[in-house]
A protein has these predicted regions:
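N-terminal helix-turn-helix
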Residues: 1-77, 81, 240-245
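Short, structured helix-loop boundary elements
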Residues: 3-7, 26, 64, 77, ...
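Short amphipathic alpha-helical signal-transduction/dimerization elements
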Residues: 18, 139, 143, 147, ...
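A structural signal for short hydrophobic beta-strand segments in well-ordered beta-sheet cores
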Residues: 53-54, 101-102, 203
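Extended hydrophobic
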Residues: 165-238, 242, 258
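Short, highly charged C-terminal tails/helix-capping segments
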Residues: 245-259
């Protein structure tokens, strides 16, 4: 590992924490990472403020709660993909159109999985890629059932115009989210990419929170989003049930419902 850069030094120190013992002294971490004690101490101090490491009264260090939180996020993401993949494959076989699975990450959607067929057309989406949530079917499906603060943060960041059909007016955007809450599905009519439309539905977890969304996308003129509503809703409901979701547990945030 290149330890001449700040990032290299950080990762070298993080790699020094091993599973063979619960905590390490500064001298042990310095030796294991190959970094001087002064450098190790400085990085550890920064990690402490970030909750990346904890220092005991005896001066020994162990990994902090922040890494457990981040690990949980990755585990949740992998879990959702694992559960959703068979249903995505069924949708692909049935529709022969592109199928997406995505999560909300800040004001963007982060694509976890994408399945394509031989007749799928080009799309701006890719696995691990990001697109502004407000312009996508999956993003709007999640936002419609998210807390008012989450929706406000997306609007405050600005509603981008990826195409002439993107919704950039906050009032119109809130009205769109209200319709999605009523219908249970979201549509993207060339809002993210010209020539493409889609239908999407949210995936809820055991608390009734929208943790992801799934969509079927295809070219305008070939894909009929309305005809795919039963299929996409059945797929997302099935995934949600695997995550512990019970339909009666779903609640729409009061402030969002009155937007």
């Amino acid at each position: 590992m290149d330890t001449t850069t700040a990032a290299g030094k950080l990762f070298a120190l993080l790699d020094a924490f091993g599973p063979e013992q619960p905590d390490f002294s500064l001298a042990e971490l310095s030796m294991r990472s190959g970094l001087p004690k002064s450098t190790s101490h400085r990085i550890l101090a920064v990690l402490q403020t970030w909750r990346g490491v904890e220092r005991s009264v005896s001066g020994r260090y162990r990994q902090g709660i922040k890494f457990f939180e981040l690990g949980g996020l990755v585990q949740d993401r992998l879990r959702i993909r694992e559960v959703a993949l068979p249903y995505m494959e069924d949708l692909l076989a049935t529709t022969r159109e592109m199928v997406h699975l995505a999560k909300l990450d800040g004001t963007d959607v982060l694509y976890i999985e994408r399945l394509v067929s031989h007749r799928s057309v080009r799309s701006p989406s890719r696995v691990a890629g990001r697109v502004p949530a407000a312009c996508t079917g999956v993003g709007k499906a999640i936002l419609a059932f998210s807390s008012p603060d989450v929706v406000k943060s997306v609007i405050a960041a600005g509603l981008p115009a990826l195409t002439p059909y993107s919704i950039t007016n906050p009032v119109q955007f809130l009205e769109t989210l209200e319709r999605i809450r009523v219908l249970g599905v979201s549509y993207d009519s060339e809002e993210a990419s010209l020539g493409l439309n889609c239908v999407a539905a949210p995936i809820f977890n055991h608390t009734g929170a929208p943790v992801a969304a799934m969509s079927v996308s295809g070219p305008v003129g070939r894909l009929s989003p309305e005809a795919l509503v039963p299929a996409i809703r059945a797929a997302t409901l099935a995934v949600g049930r695997h995550l512990g979701y019970q339909p009666k547990a779903m609640t729409v945030p009061a402030a969002a419902a009155s937007s």
